[in-house]
A protein has these predicted regions:
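ABC transporter nucleotide-binding domains
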Residues: 4-7, 14-190, 195
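Single conserved hydrophobic/aromatic residue that forms the stacking wall/gate
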Residues: 197-199
Length: 199
């Protein structure tokens, strides 16, 4: 496998009983680009992303991140990755900022500037008294993305980040995904059910 790739898989396969969710998948992701993983519901997009993050063990095949096997190197590699796979477990009776502060403490994110920057990026207010339980679906999705980028990861893996967003929200998410790549040099892998990649 080539170490020039941030993500590389070789014959990646996940099988549940007799059903193959992912079969012999070979991915090559270069630095500083946006990659779209497109497919209908049930096509294996989420399973693939979970294997890239070590959340699901492959039946066979290999995952390399920054040229190193993910297996056995999770503690070194995963802190450099931000992800959104399913909804994070936010506390309903806390504000968005308070929720991010808890995650920041757990992850060792050093200061409140990281929280404010992440909220600014996704268009949520830093000083807001609205509780998470009062958030719309779109606001919840934005907070989840803010959590994914808060620790300034080099690589982002986002599973259908536009779920629940209205057309304006979709355009805004596409815009800041593009900004993360173009101005901050992030490498981003995004899954979509429909072709709505950043332009």
């Amino acid at each position: 496998m080539d170490t020039n790739y941030i993500i590389e898989t070789k014959n990646l396969t996940k099988q549940y009983g007799s059903q193959k969710s992912v079969a012999d998948l070979n991915i090559h992701v270069k630095r500083g680009r946006i990659y779209g993983l497109l497919g209908r519901n049930g096509a294996g997009k989420t399973t693939t992303m979970k294997m890239l993050l070590g959340l699901t063990k492959p039946t066979s095949g290999e995952v390399k991140i920054w040229g190193k096997s993910l297996q056995g190197n999770e503690k070194k590699l995963l802190p450099r990755i931000g992800s959104l796979i399913e909804s994070p477990g936010f506390y309903p009776n806390l504000t968005g900022t308070e929720n991010l502060r808890i995650f920041a403490t757990l992850r060792g994110v050093p200061n409140n500037h990281a929280i404010k920057d992440a909220l600014d990026l996704v268009g949520l207010p830093y000083k807001d008294k609205k509780l998470f339980s009062q958030y719309s679906l779109g606001m919840k999705q934005r907070l989840a993305i803010a959590l994914a980028v808060m620790h300034d990861p080099e690589l982002l893996i986002l599973d259908e980040p536009i779920n629940g967003l209205d057309p304006i929200g979709i355009a805004e998410v596409r815009s800041f995904i593009r900004e993360l790549c173009d101005t901050r040099g992030k490498t981003i892998s995004v899954s979509y059910t429909h072709l709505t990649l950043p332009t």
